[in-house]
């Protein structure tokens, strides 16, 4: 899956490279073609770069199987469908990302960020919760929302393997999982393709060279840079400081989050403006709002507005339970109600435990 996404990004960059050079952009858009025709031509050209090699590999594989009297060629067809679906989605996403920027170096970075932004944010939130919330683990588990990080989700859920007989001696077939996932992403690719077209249709040529080519997304770029960049640095520095200095975790994280979040916020603005002079009344007011939102969110975690500390699942929702000491101890299904009662007791005794530890 990773090579497919890399090839998709390269193909999108190749066919839409004229968007990142002012001279080329003006020349291409001066041709007697409307943007719909340009978009379709370039889009199809880029996808052909991905699809044709897969088709050739499929045909070659079928010929090799037939030459060696191997009749189970349906697995090659499944592989071809899976790869075509993944390629379609990866390429559609790459084209969409290509429309968001006018900088050829920013596009690969955005493409990587889009593929891992959701899972990265969830892991960051989990680490913040474990640091300032009572009794919350820093272990993150994937869920259905992990589909919003497509590359990671496909790597973990699109699997092909060999099926053996009951004695594990002879291969009897091939197991494939993730077909529904590929179908969902293929449908999403159609929507993304249409959305990317409208972005291209309304794109201003003057934004060539800009890190963010859509004006409405520039505040989003600043805030994501501030929250995600500042949050990651703040977590790393807080963990380092707390290793050697005994200080309140919440106060430590709050201070570092404001400091590094502000640095990342204004650094993002410098990138957008291509200038170090970014302090103006409008931007300072926006920064003040950014700091206020950060402080409010951290305070919400601290006072458990979201009910993270108090959440206890029903016994019917639990497949397995573990008690972590020096090592995890697995609990039988019959003991799950006892574990839930123990969890409830730990929550009720929060103040007593915190006064000791």
Predicted regions and their residues:
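Membrane-interface alpha-helices at helix entry/exit sites of multi-pass transporters
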Residues: 34-46
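Internal/C-terminal transmembrane anchor helices
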Residues: 222-229, 268-308
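Alpha-helical transmembrane segments
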Residues: 193-199, 235, 262-274
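Secretory targeting signals
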Residues: 13, 44-106, 119, 127
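Central hydrophobic cores of alpha-helical transmembrane segments
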Residues: 105-118, 281-293
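Long, hydrophobic alpha-helical segments
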Residues: 1-24, 43
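Terminal transmembrane helical anchor/hairpin motif
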Residues: 1, 116-199, 203-216, 231-254, ...
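Membrane-interface segments at or immediately adjacent to transmembrane helices
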Residues: 299-357
């Amino acid at each position: 899956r990773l090579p497919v996404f890399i090839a998709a990004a390269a193909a999108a960059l190749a066919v839409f490279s004229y968007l990142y050079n002012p001279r080329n952009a003006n020349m291409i858009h001066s041709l007697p073609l409307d943007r719909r025709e340009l978009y379709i031509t370039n889009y199809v050209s880029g996808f052909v770069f991905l699809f044709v090699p897969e088709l050739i590999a499929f045909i070659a594989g079928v010929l090799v199987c037939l030459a060696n009297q191997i009749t189970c060629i349906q697995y090659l067809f499944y592989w071809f469908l899976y790869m075509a679906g993944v390629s379609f989605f990866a390429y559609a996403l790459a084209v969409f990302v290509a429309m968001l920027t006018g900088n050829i170096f920013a596009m690969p970075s955005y493409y990587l960020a889009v593929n891992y932004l959701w899972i990265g944010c969830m892991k960051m939130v989990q680490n913040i919760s474990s640091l300032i919330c009572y009794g919350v683990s820093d272990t993150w588990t994937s869920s259905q929302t992990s589909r919003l990080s497509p590359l990671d989700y496909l790597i973990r859920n699109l699997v092909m393997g060999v099926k053996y007989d009951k004695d594990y001696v002879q291969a009897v077939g091939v197991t494939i999982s993730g077909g529904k996932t590929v179908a969902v992403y293929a449908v999403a690719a159609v929507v993304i393709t249409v959305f990317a077209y409208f972005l291209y249709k309304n794109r201003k040529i003057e934004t060539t060279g800009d890190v963010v080519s859509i004006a409405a997304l520039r505040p989003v770029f600043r805030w994501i840079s501030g929250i995600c960049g500042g949050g990651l640095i703040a977590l790393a520095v807080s963990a380092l400081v707390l290793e050697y200095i005994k200080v309140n975790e919440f106060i430590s994280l709050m201070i570092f989050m404001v400091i590094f979040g502000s640095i990342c916020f204004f650094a993002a603005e410098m990138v957008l403006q291509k200038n170090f002079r970014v302090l103006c009344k409008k931007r300072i007011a926006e920064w003040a709002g950014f700091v206020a939102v950060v402080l409010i969110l951290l305070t919400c975690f601290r006072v458990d507005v979201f009910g993270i500390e108090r959440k206890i699942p029903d016994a019917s929702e639990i497949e397995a339970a573990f008690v972590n000491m020096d090592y995890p101890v697995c609990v039988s299904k019959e003991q799950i109600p006892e574990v839930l009662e123990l969890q409830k007791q730990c929550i009720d005794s929060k103040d007593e435990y915190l006064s000791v530890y």
